[in-house]
Amino acid sequence: MTFCKRRLSARCLLVAATLVVAFYVRLAWSATVEDVAMMKSPDRQKVLIEGAKKEGKVMFYTGLIVDQVVRPLKEGFEKEYPFVQVDFFRGNSENIARRVLTEYQAKRYEVDVVSGSAATSMVQRAGFMQRFYSPHLAEYPPELKDSKGFWGSTNVYFMTLGYNTRNVKANELPRTYEDLLQPRWKGQMMWSTSRGSGAPQFIGNILLTMGPEAGKAYLQKLKAQNIAKSTASARQILDLVIAGEYPLAIQIFNHHAYISKTAGAPVDWQPLEPVTATINTIGLAKHAPRPHAAMLFLDFLLSKKGQKIVQVSNYLPSHPEIPALQADLKPGGGRFKKANYISPDVLYDQGNDWVDYFQNQFLK
């Protein structure tokens, strides 16, 4: 060591560098999942990288469409961090939550990052999510991140009307919720019975924004409009409208209508404000077996670089500074201003009530 003080030889520098790397590796492997998740130190990135190199992969449970956005995100992340492989499982929120709960009850810890519109809250309520810190979360508004730190958001969904442009004239379009009660639309509308993207969420938005008394009074009037019901997804409902089976669909994803319109289909979307908005959330599993790689992945998804991949995949990025490819698909883009973001916690707490109301009032 005295020799190193006298002369900074190449050998001494190599020894010092080796000791530094060994320190970070030892630190990484002695840390708990919570330690890694909540790390805020100046050397955070270095610690995450050294730990992730040892872990080698990250397991991602998601409801996002694989070919449209999951693979591009995987490729973008692996290009940034070639020493980490992204593996994934795709399912809806219920399937993801069920899979995590089954694994955790068996003390089999496979998942690192959980994603979905309601999956994170469902898993969190079971006690199996970990609070985490990401420097990128500071760039997001309060409605797009959890105040307790359990989730952030990759993308948002806006539910609007979808209509067949051959069957509905521009001057006939409903422009308010009250317009749906016009005689013109009786028996001419369709919606999905899906809990996640159909009539129950529409009902929830009405009750949350109008209040229980006024909301239920409105819904009773809407019930008299004899809306056609289908167990099909919102995307499939839109396809039925494109085919001309019904002129108007309630509660479809506006970006789906945009994609079909640009492909030449006779369809467009119309917002009713406040627009129903839901959030695709992401978070860290409580016993994530690869927490360093998981935190790098979460950082990447929340970063502007990751959000731009979401953008070019024709999803609607959550980051307020990353617009949709078609800017008017998001609030403030020209077609609507007001959106009611239904948080996953509200969806978890009140979703069953909305389903019950729909089944009791609209299905009987």
Predicted regions, residues:
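Extracytoplasmic ligand-binding site segments that recognize negatively charged/polar headgroups
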Residues: 59-74, 86-104, 108-245
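Short amphipathic alpha-helical coupling segments at ligand-binding clamshell hinges
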Residues: 73, 214-218, 289-301, 309-312
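A bilobed periplasmic-binding-protein/Venus flytrap-type ligand-binding module shared by bacterial periplasmic
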Residues: 160-167, 204-208, 279-290, 309-310
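Extracytoplasmic "Venus flytrap"
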Residues: 33-45, 53-72, 197, 280
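Extracellular/periplasmic bilobal clamshell ligand-binding domains
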Residues: 327-364
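Periplasmic-binding protein-like
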Residues: 142, 156-159, 185-195, 218-223, 228-231, 301-324, ...
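A ligand-binding cleft/hinge motif common to bilobed small-molecule-binding domains
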Residues: 120-123, 247-266
